[in-house]
Amino acid sequence: MHSKTRLPQAFIDKMTGILPNQLKIEDFIAVCQRPLRRAIRVNTLKISVEKFQIRAQEQGWVLTAIPWCAEGFWIELQEEPTPLGNSAEHLGGLCYIQEASSMLPVAALFHFFTPTTQSIVLDAAAAPGSKTTQIAAKMNNSGLIIGNEFSSSRIKMLHANIQRCGIKNVALTHFDARVFGKWLPGTFDAILLDAPCSGEGTVRKDKYAMNNWSQSSINEIASTQQELILSAFHALKEDGILIYSTCTLSHEENQDICFFLKDKFPEHIEFLDLETLFTDAKKTRTAEGFLHIWPQVYDSEGFFVAAIKKTKACTVAPAVKRLGKFPFIRPTRQKEQALYEYFASQFAITNIKGMLYQRDQELWLFPDPIKPLIKELRFSRLGIKIAEEFGNGRKSGFKSTHEFVTCFGDSIDAHKLELSAEQAQEFYQGRDIRDIDAKGFKGEVLLSYRGHVIGLGKSLDNRIKNSLPRELIRDNNLFIK
């Protein structure tokens, strides 16, 4: 929050009434005047925390560990010649810029949930992708995540972040999350419902957060949240884990939503205690075991997290779905074999797991657990496009995709060229790479910077042709080293 931002007096009065006895409203108001500390989360699908810390130190970044997320750090940049979002670490998917409190729901989920290679997880309100990518890293890119987003304008950003982070176990859907309980009852091993809310905890980063604040709007939002948590509960398997979270502070949107569910199904749910989630979690623990994060306690956003276990199954009347035609088919065995032979000969990679599907000339890799859901949902995007087919007969072949190399590139040692900082900048700016020794390279080549693959090129006589998708090109103000 900026110091000029005014907190409505009605809001201050309300917060005074619900503030725990050990906290002071003056401290709450004061912390709301201070800028929010920036934070990042290391993407362990691409780099270890230890190796990232070394890179950060070389950059002059000061990292302070976030207690509830082993991969999370508050970050201070001593010099900032370029935005953090244009750093090589961010562009290459090695880290995700994410507020510290928003790392809590996923940490809470995996405090109680141990995934398998067949686990199916729903992120009910997924955009822009911070929690979806965090879940994927915790699942080590295995199993299946349904990343649902109701806002059509945010689906593109969600996909861009999933692609940048090298994630291959996500299927994207575009529905009102209230449909999942009737459409897919008892389906998910775990569900994250980071519910839409009034955003009372976000005033430190959004000076407009309180412009439309009112008790009537809170009541209206809470009604939607009740419907969302009911749907999530029905979609959850018996013994499944549901995490309910918001970035707001009012009880109507937090504790009261959990009590609403408990009152509806007193014999079917159990509140799980989050006191042992991290050191000092008890400072924000409620009597029920929820975490109600006041911003002055950890110098963070305001937040709420509850962990709920479904202890007993219950029935729900299924709804009629209109799915439309599924646009993919399984390729022939010959084509599948030809594709994998191409990858083996060009990149010496043979450990590609998943189900191969085809749409026109495109070849896609789907996560194995998706199979029973293919006829149950309409997907906005499913799996990753790994190649495109071209030509006919002897002149036919395959072209790899940017998605393929972001997901598999760091596990490939063959046919890889290391770029300098200047060459990596040129690549992100969409330019071809010249003045590079590419002798011995033919056709497609992986391009890496500081040991991590950042994209794909094609070796020609005097240059490497850039294959970066147009929508990912950055024109200026990129990293210096």
Curated annotation (Swiss-Prot):
Its main location: cytoplasm. It catalyses: cytidine(1407) in 16S rRNA + S-adenosyl-L-methionine = 5-methylcytidine(1407) in 16S rRNA + S-adenosyl-L-homocysteine + H(+). Coiled coil: none annotated. Its EC number is 2.1.1.178. It is found in: Cytoplasm. Signal peptide: none annotated. One of its GO terms (biological process) is rRNA base methylation. The active site is at C247 (nucleophile). Keywords: Cytoplasm, Methyltransferase, RNA-binding, rRNA processing, S-adenosyl-L-methionine, Transferase. One of its GO terms (cellular component) is cytoplasm. CDD domains: AdoMet_MTases. It comes from the Bacteria. One of its GO terms (molecular function) is rRNA (cytosine-C5-)-methyltransferase activity. PROSITE patterns: NOL1_NOP2_SUN, SAM_MT_RSMB_NOP. S-adenosyl-L-methionine binds at A125, A126, A127, P128, G129, S130, K131, E149, D176, D194. Belongs to the class I-like SAM-binding methyltransferase superfamily. RsmB/NOP family. Specifically methylates the cytosine at position 1407 (m5C1407) of 16S rRNA. This is Ribosomal RNA small subunit methyltransferase F. The lineage of its organism: Bacteria, Pseudomonadati, Pseudomonadota, Gammaproteobacteria, Alteromonadales. The gene is rsmF.
